[in-house]
Amino acid sequence: VKRLSGWDVFMLASETPNVHQHTLKVAVVDTSGFEGVASFERFREVFRARLPVLEPMHYQLVRTPWHLHRPVWYEDAELDLDYHLQRVEVPAPGGRRELDAVIGRIASTPLDRSRPLWQFYFAEGLTGQRIAVIGKIHHVLADGVASANLMARTLQWSDATDEQAGGAFAPPRVRDVMRFAAHDHVARVRTLPSAVRDGVVGAFRLQRRARQRLSHPDLADRFDPPPTFLNHKLSPGRTFASAVLPLAQVKAVSKKLEVTINDLVLTVAAGALSVLHGQVVNT
């Protein structure tokens, strides 16, 4: 059993039927140089072989009885690969737009909290001997960087072994969860003096910053944006759209402007949203 961090608990609490807290990672792979056939069956076989070294994939949320403690991770949960590994077909003609529509549908459904919080989709039907792998992983299981690393490890097909996860699944007993919760509460009590001290220091810091903001009212305006067609009430459905930027050109421009690649891509995206908003307002 493993303790969830405070941030993880916040992410769980902030999830609603309309606001999902999973992240998507997408890899489009050209399989023309592969030895053998890059099939769903092969993908499933490789994934199963890698599971022993993909530790977070075995984590499952367990609620503490009567909510006496925050949820905890059970670290050796049983996996139903028929649920976690899905096969999807990209409709003809199998281009980027069609793949985007499939990704949007995948993003629109929340992960099942009664199972380990991840799924991978193997998308077939793309043009040019390509396949796509779409990973859906909850933020409490892995952040964006960790999710990308997990995705990369699942795509290393060439050196996969036949190692299987050992041990039989045995769900945690209630008394074990309660014992863990009690020990953790005792450990938290020991840190109470420092927590109170940090809280007092933080309160004074917030008060000081509030006074500073009063002398710069223009800063507060940035956190109160005007209403647009985008920032309204959400529904569960998601629409996904992608664009292609030449990496060499992006690197050259970012070097010329002495900014990071992230700075440049975010600026391009913000500019595109501004243009789109203007078009919608005008129509």
Show the residue positions of the predicted features.
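Soluble acyl-CoA-dependent acyltransferase catalytic core bearing the H(X)4D motif
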Residues: V1-W7, L24-S39, R44-T283
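Long, Pro/Ser/Thr-rich low-complexity/intrinsically disordered regulatory tracts in eukaryotic proteins
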Residues: G6-W7, M11, T16-P17, H22
